[in-house]
Amino acid sequence: MRRETRRPRGMALGLALWMTGCGMAHPSVKAEAPAKDTVAFVDVNVVPMDSERLLAHQTVVVRGERIVALGPVDATPVPVGAARVEGRGRYLMPGLADMHLHLVPGTGQPEDPAGQVLALLLANGVTSARALGGPKDTSRLVRDRVARGEVLGPTLRVAAPSLHGKSVQGPEQARQRVREYKAAGYDLLKTHGSLGRETYDAMMSEARAQGLAVSGHVTPDVGLFHALESGQQIEHLDGYLNELLPENDSARQEVGQVEVGEPLERMEPARIPALAEATRKAGVWSSPTLALFETVTSPEGVESLRTRPELRYAKQASVEAWTQMLANDSQMTSAPAGRKHRFAELRRQVTRGLYTAGAKLLVGSDSPQLFMVAGFAVHREMEALAAAGIPPYGVLEAATRNAAEYLGEAGTWGTVAEGRRADLLLLEANPLEDVKHTRDIAGVMVRGQWLPRSELDAMLERTAVVANAPPRVNKGVATATSAAP
């Protein structure tokens, strides 16, 4: 990591703000003119995420939805009347992106379930998200309401209803569905299990013609290598463990995931480098969702999972349903501890192999489900990636600039630079030293709206009340004891 203190000077213009006391105008304008919707992060350490470096003692000025100035504190003036955020000893990085979550019913209002998910995401520093499932009408409605400024939440990209063996019957219907979903305004397609090869190929061909990315699961009929050749982005490492088995092993035909069973003993990790290199060459993105699978196979047991502090923000009915689901999945929960460990370790090895080969990773939580609470689950996934051997910068990259690049928006957000959308995360400690520091949040800015620690705590409290949780004494975002700055 390089530590830098200088940067090309830019004009100190201002940027957007969501807090009381907006400022006055930039000095280049008449002093009497107000610098409306302007906020300056003063004397802050910037983690720009354009490379592995740290810019010490910077001032970052934001106006509207954009960063308009970034430079050394002694050379970057703060517009007169701009709202100032103290940055000394703090770290400013791009907001996080959850590239695999599910929306729930609602319109995005604070009192409904969808609104609660939005609040939990923001309170944990997630300013962009990709929804890969949820009620058909909810996803586009909430996405558009956020975009219009009617409700506050991360910028959303939403997938169409999943294409699978029950929703499409044959190649022609697959093509028709793709055209329908494009016309309906969905941002991408999701594929699930049980698609035959011919139907899959028709879907992928039409998706390319319509300019829609496809993400999702890998079925035995399709296979990992054909999915890679087709350009599908892969969720959950689907198909990778299957490919670690000997060529003639019947367990290769299990749908997407070889679970915690006897076939694990026959897997050959020596196959991982070739799989990773094939992924890199194909330019395919992967969202491993390590934390979800490690939660499901956790040796600590369901009762321990029920003590997670973030469950305060989940409805008790959801917690009970998750408990029952794990209790009913005997293969996952009753497997020997050694087999669970091997399952988790093989997934870590595949993920580490992908990173080492230069294949692109994304952070995806697959929340809210199975003790994975929206927002909080992003931090669990980042920490799981770190535990898999991905260095801090690589994890942060997967959670920021990689997501923007995957969506074709690398010049819009995902880094801290002049002209970028002001989706920012202000931290109390350096995330390049430990990704756990992304939990220690002093404030979040989403599209130029500033949410200080006090407002994030208020959002969490409102969510907890709706979830019928008891009041909390110590406030914080991703830990139960972090305090407001």
What are the residue ranges of the model-derived segments?
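Divalent-metal coordination cores built from histidine and acidic residues
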Residues: 87-101, 113-266, 270-310, 468
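Acidic, glycine-enriched loop/beta-strand segments at the rims
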Residues: 29, 46-59, 72-73, 373-376, ...
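Histidine-rich, glycine-flanked metal-binding segment
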Residues: 26-37, 46, 51-93
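Active-site neighborhoods of metal-dependent hydrolases
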Residues: 183-187, 195, 245-388, 472-485
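Extracellular/periplasmic ectodomains of large secreted or surface enzymes and adhesion receptors
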Residues: 24-28, 447-485
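Bacterial N-terminal signal peptides that target proteins for export
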Residues: 1-13
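Divalent metal-coordination and catalytic microenvironments
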Residues: 44, 60, 65, 89, ...
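C-terminal motif of bacterial Sec signal peptides marking the signal peptidase cleavage site
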Residues: 20-21
